[in-house]
């Protein structure tokens, strides 16, 4: 028992001395991990007699509970301290007087800038902008786009669903801007040539994914558009956006419910010293998905696939910004850090065009 008391004193002392969450995690692993000191004691219970096991087991479990309680309490203290330090570091006094003339001007967020670039480039190719609501019906987000009832995208782990209404119908936060294409085809007759930029939502969060992100999709519907036209549009867009005289694209067969055939598009690039350059090199980078609009989607939108055809594509706006302007972590886009915006933001009077994109 004396050994357990000594171990308890040592562990509680280490927990109290942990200066940050990584140090605290090291103490937890050293005590409660698979090879930790308390875990070793618990594994040795099987070698004891029933009476010893009863006495020692109760004491070891009490030690384990005490350590878990101390870990939880210390973790809360460290999280509070980290939050206070961050708030103190980012505090802005909004009561300060207006900055004098000549002070640094505000900057345009990279997402806003890239959306402006997309609008300008595609406008030069005759596209208009179509928009729709962020909260969509299941019908527009899935059914009219030819998603089968058992498609994984309809699961809770991938889509944000609202509670059902009194009729049992559930609305969703749109998972793509494709519902805008549906609304466009229902509202107007071909020829159609639109891009659909906007916010989209999925249950995902890591260095390259966030629960809310931005996407732009394009749609062309008429009587004769084909994959050759799609290839030309994508090449011209990527050349203008990445400001290169040439791009080489690789089309790979893929599957999307709303297009047939469906393709993933890779762009040729080189990677050197952390920099990606397009139009050269031996590497390939996946950049977007596309395909010919599925006949079922046309029928669902009141268009005869025997008369009309067309193509569509989709690409992540946040990903475009990261690739063009060298931003490593998508999560920083939405942390409202003025210092980050000052570094990556843009001046208000810069304008892109089809002939030239816009680099800082």
UniProtKB/Swiss-Prot annotation:
Disulfide bonds: none annotated. It is found in: Cytoplasm. Keywords: Aminoacyl-tRNA synthetase, ATP-binding, Cytoplasm, Ligase, Magnesium, Metal-binding, Nucleotide-binding, Protein biosynthesis. Mg(2+) binds at residue 260. It catalyses: tRNA(Phe) + L-phenylalanine + ATP = L-phenylalanyl-tRNA(Phe) + AMP + diphosphate + H(+). Binds 2 magnesium ions per tetramer. It holds the Pfam family Phe_tRNA-synt_N. PROSITE patterns: AA_TRNA_LIGASE_II (PS50862). One of its GO terms (molecular function) is ATP binding. InterPro entries: aa-tRNA-synth_II, aa-tRNA-synth_II/BPL/LPL, Phe-tRNA-synth_IIc_asu, Phe-tRNA_ligase_II_N, Phe_tRNA_ligase_alpha1_bac, Phenylalanyl-tRNA_Synthase, tRNA-bd_arm. One of its GO terms (biological process) is phenylalanyl-tRNA aminoacylation. Its main location: cytoplasm. Its EC number is 6.1.1.20. Its cofactor is Mg(2+). One of its GO terms (cellular component) is cytoplasm. Belongs to the class-II aminoacyl-tRNA synthetase family. Phe-tRNA synthetase alpha subunit type 1 subfamily. Tetramer of two alpha and two beta subunits. NCBIfam families: pheS. PANTHER family: PHENYLALANINE--TRNA LIGASE, MITOCHONDRIAL, PHENYLALANYL-TRNA SYNTHETASE. This is Phenylalanine--tRNA ligase alpha subunit. The lineage of its organism: Bacteria, Pseudomonadati, Pseudomonadota, Alphaproteobacteria, Hyphomicrobiales.
